[in-house]
Amino acid sequence: EVKLVESGGGLVQPGGSLRLSCATSGFTFSAFYMEWVRQPPGKRLEWIAASRNKANDYTTEYSASVKGRFFVSRDTSQSILYLQMNALRAEDTAIYYCARDVYYGYDYWFDVWGAGTTVTVSS
């Protein structure tokens, strides 16, 4: 069974930092692109970060809203995806999800999601 389990969310003051984790199991972690997506209260899902697979040297990509503040990484020995979040702002308040990215031909989609972890940025 493929599983993704996020953790590390919580309440943090503006300007603070948090590190989210996504523990994965049931598939070959190194073979897949992995993504971070968030949903602010009352808003739509927003893609924020990607970690490409081993074949693509685990290179990363970020949305403009988090670039330079958030950093995605992997522990391939434990099959864990991380999201280091720095200089947090009130607008970063959201439920954060990790997702597995699959593709066939030119079509990409996220086929497995975790339950999410909540981040609240407030003083």
Curated annotation (Swiss-Prot):
Gene3D superfamilies: Immunoglobulins (2.60.40.10). PROSITE patterns: IG_LIKE (PS50835). Residues 1-114 form the Ig-like domain. One of its GO terms (molecular function) is antigen binding. Keywords: Adaptive immunity, Hybridoma, Immunity, Immunoglobulin. It holds the Pfam family V-set. One of its GO terms (biological process) is immunoglobulin mediated immune response. GO terms for cellular component: extracellular region; immunoglobulin complex. SMART domains: IG, IGv. The keyword Protease does not apply. This chain was isolated from a myeloma protein that binds phosphorylcholine. This is Ig heavy chain V region HPCG14. It comes from Mus musculus (Mouse).
